[in-house]
Amino acid sequence: TLTISGTLDGDLNNIVRGYIAAGNEIDNATVVVESGGVIQGKSNAIMGRETSGLTVTNSGTIEATSSKAIQLQDSQNATITNKSGGLIFADTNAIVQQSVGTEDATGASITNAGTIYSVENRAIYFYDGATDATFTNESGGIIYNTSTFATVQIDTNSTLVNSGTIDNRNSPSNAGIAIVGNNNTITLKDKSILVGKIDGGSTTGNTLKFQHGVGQGYYYETEGSFTLQDLDGNQVVKGSAGSVGQGGNETLD
């Protein structure tokens, strides 16, 4: 366990490193950044490549001045918790996972009650075989970016639940959530905010669930094919998903 209560920084890559070389990783490591603590580096402020069971709990700041505040390439079962007041950010792609080697990139869990953001790219970027991930943006949690890229991108067989804010601050015509793999489930809870499209591209087997309360109106611009479910029994139409408050029977033309 590494606990940071002060500042650990430098104009370097891999400030906290769980990966040395292939076959030489630190599994089941825990990194705790306390309130006021800072990990700051150039790229890969926390390098979790090829690790298993990495746990990061942040109440302070994890920052990459270039790319990847947290790098999860080829990692398994990582747990990232960004608590209220916590900040995770990078100039490009704040939290990243992909599969590029012989190990799977799978089972990551990201829970956010603080702020995660990227300036030039995506705040959360899962792609190229990153599977079975769970993303939970809690009430009060903010995930945003200021570029034309999607704010959050997920890959395959993953779950995203938004009770907070996901915000593409460049333009609402960009993707707030992008999906590049199949068989994912996205749930948008009451009082959650999504600025940007939900873009499923040519993927299949994806489900959008809405839980805004009986009789509540909402509208989300979507691209691609989705199964739509309103968990409160309201009627929801396909295309761009929406429901206009009309009691228990709701439609949007």
Which ranges hold each PLM region?
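Long, low-complexity, polar and repeat-rich extracellular regions
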Residues: 1-253
